[in-house]
Amino acid sequence: MAEPASVTVTFDDVALYFSEQEWEILEKWQKQMYKQEMKTNYETLDSLGYAFSKPDLITWMEQGRMLLISEQGCLDKTRRTTSPPTDEQLNMKNTGKLLCFDDEGTPRTKEEDCRLNGPQKQDLCAALRGKERKILLAQTATFQSPSLRETEILNKKVSITAYDPDKKDLRHKPRETPGRLEIPTGPRCYSCYVCRKVFQVRRDLLKHKRSHSKSQLCRYPKYKNSSRGKSELRRTQRLLCQKKRFQCSECEKSYFLKGSLVTHQVVHTGQRPYPCPECDKTFRYRANLKKHLCLHRGERPFCCGECGRAFVQQCELTEHLRLHSGEKPFQCPQCDRCFRLKRGMKVHLTQHSGKRPFHCPECGRSFSRKAALKTHQRTHSEEKPFSCGECGRKFIYKIKLDEHIRVHTGEKPFSCPECNKSFRLKRSLKAHGLQHIGKRPFQCPECSRGFFWRNAMRAHQRLHSEQKPFPCAECGKRFTRPSKLACHTRVHDRQKEFPCGECKKTFSQQSRLTQHLKVHTTEKPFSCAECGRSFRRRAHLTEHTRLHSGEEPFQCPECDKSFSWKASMKFHQRMHRDEKPFACGECDKTYTHQSQLTEHLRLHSGEKPYQCPECEKTFRLKGNLKSHLLQHSGQKPFSCVMCGKSFTQQYRLTEHIRVHSGEKPFQCPECDKSYCIRGSLKVHLYKHSGERPFQCPECGKGFLQKRSLKAHLCLHSGERPFSCDECGRSFTYVGALKTHIAVHAKEKPSSL
């Protein structure tokens, strides 16, 4: 048997040299990899059993010095049977092309990777790319067949520079290449595609590739802690080298894997092949079903270390952690705005592009997100999937339910940094912040009136334009405000009222009737810790506790006045808007509150539904009955701190305090005269107008005050309601009784 052909290889055939300029460009990990690969190549040649001297390259590396090649490095001419190539043919460093030699030793260039021309041919290539990179040799010996005839590799003479970092000096030393090695060519060799290292045994190549995988894991940290990190990394590297061969015929989107294309096509077909066995909800992907099942099982395996909040998915926890860190990794390329979530940036990009691909089939309105379209469609279907567990009220949006629940819990998470006042809604805090700076950002273009809220300004503008955008669905009548429409619809709702079976009281809504039925039950589970009073609902207890604490959380954005209850603030805001939606059908007088209209209607009907159980006297107003009952009991709970005088009603005490303070808030517009009591101003205005609204039905005489008319009627009837306790004498007027009592007071000292 003939001996196999051999090829002569030197160490420089598998070595790589850098200039000083190139060495500084390399990163630290690249320098380490370079040194490791050079040592490995040397050890591979040494392991073949041939004796040769250790190259200076390896010696300097062991001494910790950098190996640099000078600019004057050159290649020796090739010793072959044919004519050697010229210097012009070898000097390819500025061409950026590949330098190759064919069988006859003739050099030639190629734009692409070198390939073998046949089983008996071998190209030895040197990749010399770019003007800056002066890599003089990067060759790998490649073995093809046993019949390969003997060739000689380029014998090189290179000028090497040894650079010692400590001494900072350069020493130029011309070096001859070490002796050649006769390496027999095997039947097949295996080359590493990363570093071009050659192996004769395949398992050695596989073992060698693991070292690259470890180094790659350091470069790609997201694969480092995964149990399948290495396999995923190899798969990722393989995909990066491939093309996206699998294209969707519907949207022309391309994928690396056929399975990814099949998964994507489910979006176009609308298939949801994975149903949930618990709630019959269907999903496109099995992974989404698995995540959904965690909700039924109550599993939340991913917990936040900062606040303890748990999540179903790892990605949800990752997004949540950005709240604590403040990280916003997704930046808009148009305006440099940053976002915490990628989907937030995608929605933002539609503002730049103006694209709104999701259209409502009912009204034609467009949206940038599919979720926003689904939420909008609930307004057409009147679907309200989010209901309150306390009062049963339903909402279209989840965020509205969250805001409503704070009414029951009393939670106020938004605090003002200036005055530490807390608010239930974030928009209320924003409006409150404008009060500190005195800014009313929304101004009416007609009258320049300022508003804290845009909605308040729009409602105000309808007064100028006489626009009435709120029509009644029953009769078609239009209104400027939704509150006026709501009051009007009550006229139609009287035919659709829900009566209470216990007290025959009727309600316009079923939910109101449900709440009212709790009145007839004796259960009151919510008790006040201060006074022990019990309530049927937690919300009522929350409102009651504000009486003890003096808290007034609802502030009017117009005048800064505060209220304990939201309903009181809403009624107060109607005064600013000059809104009086409740009108009397008899005299066309309007009122802010429904209760005011109800009390007014009793003037026309003469109804007095409140009767005193002591004297059977009847009253038109419930407040008047309460004040009257205090006269029977002799109780006067409202006392003046100045003089100790007591009153049966709060407003009487308020009027009395003005006597001490000298305050006269009610001023006549005609003569600038001021009064402590509003009723006194009304009587005074009758003098200017000459009107006497209270007339006697017997003689037609008119009076300014109602009590004057009552006293006058006693003259016709002969009644003397005011009697003296001392002598029993009776009088028509209370003033006459007081004068008479003074007479008795003067007589008592004289008798002594």
Curated annotation (Swiss-Prot):
Q: Which UniProt keywords apply?
A: Cytoplasm, DNA-binding, Metal-binding, Nucleus, Repeat, Transcription, Transcription regulation, Zinc, Zinc-finger
Q: Which SUPFAM superfamilies match?
A: beta-beta-alpha zinc fingers, KRAB domain (Kruppel-associated box)
Entry superkingdom: Eukaryota
GO BP annotation list: negative regulation of DNA-templated transcription; regulation of transcription by RNA polymerase II
- Where does each C2H2-type zinc finger lie? 190-212, 246-268, 274-296, 302-324, 330-352, 358-380, 386-408, 414-436, 442-464, 470-492, 498-520, 526-548, 554-576, 582-604, 610-632, 638-660, 666-688, 694-716, 722-744
- Cited SMART domains: KRAB, ZnF_C2H2
| ATP-binding in keyword set | no
Cellular localization per UniProt:
Nucleus; Cytoplasm
What GO molecular function annotation could you give as one example from this UniProt entry?
DNA-binding transcription factor activity, RNA polymerase II-specific
Q: Which GO terms describe its cellular component?
A: cytoplasm; nucleoplasm; nucleus
Predominant location = nucleus
Q: Which residues form the KRAB domain?
A: 9-80
Q: Which protein family is it in?
A: Belongs to the krueppel C2H2-type zinc-finger protein family.
Per the record, the domain comment is: The C2H2 domain is necessary for the transcriptional repression.
What the protein does comes down to: Acts as a transcriptional repressor.
Q: What's the protein name? A: Zinc finger protein 425
Q: Which organism is it from?
A: Homo sapiens (Human)
Q: What is the lineage of its organism?
A: Eukaryota, Metazoa, Chordata, Craniata, Vertebrata
